Amino acid sequence: MKMFKQAILFAGILTAGALSAQSAQMNNMIKVGANVGLAVPSDNTSMAVGVDVAYQNLITPGFGLGIATGYTHYFGKENNGYDNNDVGVVPVGALIRIYPKQTGFYFGTDLGYGFLVGDDKVATNSTLDRPDGGFYIKPEIGYHNQSWNFFVQYQKVFVGSKGDLPNQDYNVGNIGAGFSYNIPLGK
């Protein structure tokens, strides 16, 4: 719970700073996108599909801050005799992006807290409770222009050893690819 409060405080500070520092040269946008990925490591899940929504404020032409959320669905799989349940991630975090040029290569990350949603148990044939969430990170690198972003990403919710079963680590993470469309909100 302490990490959750820190993540919310961090996101609030970044958002307040971005909103209070606006000038005529800043661009505001909503980013709406989708992604797909393969679970890594894949003890309890096989693949993931997700949607992303974010608000971004360009503090300078090459540096953006904002807030990000969305939903990623991880498909459970059978492993070591466990019939693992699907799990969803609802992240709440800060968005940080670096754009070296107006069009071309970019990189950045989302940092915050990932809420895990879905079945209460790790597996249908287990009594172990699913973790509620943990520290969330989503670094990405890709290509951008004024309207679109195309990227590869790593997405992970750190839950420690919560949800681990004998011979199986509980993991919520993937390596994938995605895109987002930028909806301009003005300067």
Which ranges hold each PLM region?
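Cleavable N-terminal export/targeting peptides
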Residues: 1-27, 185-187
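Short glycine/proline- and aromatic-enriched beta-strand/turn motifs that initiate or cap beta-hairpins
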Residues: 21-59, 65, 174-176, 180-187
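Residues that define the transmembrane beta-barrel architecture of outer-membrane proteins
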Residues: 28-30, 45-49, 86-92, 131-137, ...
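Membrane-embedded beta-strand positions of outer-membrane beta-barrel proteins
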Residues: 30-36, 67-69, 94-96, 107-111, ...
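Outer-membrane beta-barrel translocator domains and adjoining extracellular loop/strand segments
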Residues: 42-49, 77-85, 117-131, 160-169
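Predominantly the C-terminal beta-signal and adjacent terminal strand-loop region
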Residues: 74-77, 135-187
